């Protein structure tokens, strides 16, 4: 499993390195893609069904655990019609003989992995990002871009290069969720080294986000990188809490993102139900506009239902209350409200990575398709866009090879299939 476009150097086993099993990592990367797809498609059933009752669009009471397995209710743009994916709220699977479709929660990450390989680099330039977007995103609608991503793309078409495309002076949608769902994968390219992951993700995040929306994205990237460092002797819930507490350093103390983290964690540790925590998030941040979260007063479409902040707070509910159980985390995330396919995809990908392909199959007691069609939403890839999770995982290993050797000055032992990654 050598990358033919990369020169592997002689192994140097230095002191102060961490050893990561390269073969096992490939299985975990497969788990990332599979977990993200299950969670993404499950969350799409309930996406924008429930956004609260402020402004022109009112959606009634939020979902609770009682709604799982019950009829799906229409989304804010569903014209009174439930999801075409499923008449009921539940998990969405692609059977072994079918193909997973790409969506905006997986496809930009797929593009970034591809660009890192094609450009033979670990840190993409603004021009490489722009050229990649323009090559692989359809220029006409339906192009599966929204808010900040769509605005950044329009600016790229006019010749603008990141990071200018995410500057609030150019992109009024900079506070929306977009960077959170397009950049988590960078955490997996720098196992045990969130510092390097953040360096790799900095420009992709800045392509569409600034301040809180960027800090939240950095939090997710750090969580993904820290997953390789977590103590596997701990319970999954304790591993995740350790990762989250470390990733929290990405959120400045005075930011609303930091205060949201502390608030949801406090609700969780105080013994409230996840529904009570979610309802409190809605009341605190959208009704009362506390902790500096002032989006309601701006009278945005759907009261800022795509915003990075409210969806971050919602994602923390499913993170903490899911306790590392992939099924429960996806379930809570799908029922939490707002842009529910995004938090589910983020945690489905992270937990899928932590338990790997076999762990996911065991959790759901079934097997799944390993095929992925990137051309459902994007364009310009080989094999008419049909790929497999194994191939995508191998490409992820190859990206990581370059990071380990060229950026972190570690070693790759192809005989033992191990990475030797220096401690910071």
Stretches found by the model and what they are:
Residues 2-63:
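Flexible propeptides and autoinhibitory/regulatory segments associated with cysteine proteases
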Residues 3, 258, 262-296, 301, ...:
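Acidic, carboxylate-rich catalytic segments that either coordinate divalent cations
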Residues 6-22, 152-176, 183-193, 202-207, ...:
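Accessory "access/gating" subregions that flank catalytic or transport cores
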Residues 25-30, 38, 156-168, 172-180, ...:
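Mature, well-folded catalytic/scaffold domains that follow N-terminal targeting or propeptide regions
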Residues 38, 42-44, 48-73, 209-212, ...:
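Catalytic phosphate/nucleotide-handling subdomain of diverse soluble enzymes
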Residues 45-93, 106-108, 130, 140-141:
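Active-site-surrounding "flap" and adjacent substrate/cofactor-binding loops of secreted or lumenal enzymes
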Residues 86-95, 100-102, 106, 112-141, ...:
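N-terminal leader/propeptide and maturation segments of large enzyme subunits in energy/redox metabolism
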Residues 95-104, 108, 113-217:
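Active-site cavity-forming subdomains of large catalytic enzyme subunits
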């Amino acid at each position: 499993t050598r990358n033919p476009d990369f020169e592997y150097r002689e192994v140097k086993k230095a002191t102060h390195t961490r050893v990561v099993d390269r073969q096992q990592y490939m299985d975990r990367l497969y788990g990332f893609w599979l977990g993200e797809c299950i969670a993404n498609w499950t969350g799409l059933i309930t996406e924008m069904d429930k956004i609260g009752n402020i402004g022109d669009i009112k959606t009634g009471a939020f979902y609770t655990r009682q709604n799982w397995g019950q009829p799906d209710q229409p989304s804010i743009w569903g014209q009174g019609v439930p999801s075409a994916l499923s008449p009921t709220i539940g998990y969405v699977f692609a059977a072994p003989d079918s193909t997973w479709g790409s969506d905006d929660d997986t496809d930009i990450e797929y593009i970034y992995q591809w660009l890192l390989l094609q450009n033979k680099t670990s840190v993409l330039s603004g021009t490489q990002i722009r050229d990649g977007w323009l090559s692989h995103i359809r220029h006409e609608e339906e192009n599966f871009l929204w808010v900040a991503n769509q605005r950044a793309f329009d600016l790229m078409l006019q010749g603008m290069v990141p990071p200018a495309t995410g500057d609030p002076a150019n992109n009024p949608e900079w506070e929306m969720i977009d960077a959170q769902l397009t950049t988590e994968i960078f955490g997996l390219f720098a196992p045990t080294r969130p510092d390097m992951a953040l360096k790799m993700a900095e420009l992709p995040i800045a392509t569409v986000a600034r301040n809180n929306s960027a800090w939240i994205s950095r939090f997710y990237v750090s969580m993904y990188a820290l997953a390789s460092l977590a103590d596997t002797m701990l319970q999954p819930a304790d591993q995740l809490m350790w990762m989250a507490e470390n990733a929290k350093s990405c959120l400045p103390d005075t930011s609303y993102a930091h205060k949201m983290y502390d608030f949801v964690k406090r609700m969780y540790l105080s013994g409230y139900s996840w529904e009570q925590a979610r309802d409190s998030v809605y009341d605190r941040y959208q009704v009362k506009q506390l902790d500096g979260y002032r989006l309601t007063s701006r009278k945005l479409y759907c009261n800022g239902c795509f915003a990075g902040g409210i969806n971050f707070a919602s994602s923390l509910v499913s993170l903490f209350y899911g306790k590392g159980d992939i099924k429960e985390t996806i379930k809570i995330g799908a029922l939490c409200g707002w842009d529910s396919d995004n938090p589910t995809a983020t945690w489905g990908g992270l937990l899928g990575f932590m338990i790997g392909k076999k762990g996911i199959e065991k959790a759901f007691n079934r097997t799944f398709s390993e095929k992925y069609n990137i051309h459902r939403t994007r364009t310009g890839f080989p094999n008419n866009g049909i790929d497999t999770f194994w191939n995508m995982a191998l490409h992820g290993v190859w990206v990581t090879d370059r990071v380990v050797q060229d950026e972190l000055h570690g070693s790759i032992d192809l005989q033992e299939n191990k990475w030797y990654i220096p401690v910071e």
